[in-house]
Amino acid sequence: MTTPSDRPEDTVDRKLLEILVCPVTKGPLEFDGARQELISRSAKLAYPIREGIPIMLPEEARKIE
């Protein structure tokens, strides 16, 4: 039996995170588990993760400081 924290949508696979890059800068991304976002510091964008799927569209990203 799985607990809510064991669900795959609560995290991002490390291998996937190694492969994914920011579509704007082609730079690395950081996983923010609390907000369920992938952060591009160079583009100052936060890409949402919905139901365990990273949404890598710049128009869907949140601008960050």
Curated annotation (Swiss-Prot):
- PANTHER family documented for this protein: PROTEIN PREY, MITOCHONDRIAL, ZGC:162634
**Can you tell which superkingdom this protein's organism belongs to?**
Bacteria
The UniProt similarity line reads: Belongs to the UPF0434 family.
Protein's organism: Nitrobacter hamburgensis (strain DSM 10229 / NCIMB 13809 / X14)
InterPro entries noted in UniProt: Trm112-like (IPR005651)
- Recorded GO CC terms: cytosol
User: Which Pfam families is this protein grouped with?
Assistant: Trm112p
Q: What is this protein called?
A: UPF0434 protein Nham_0083
User: Where exactly are the transmembrane stretches of this chain?
Assistant: none
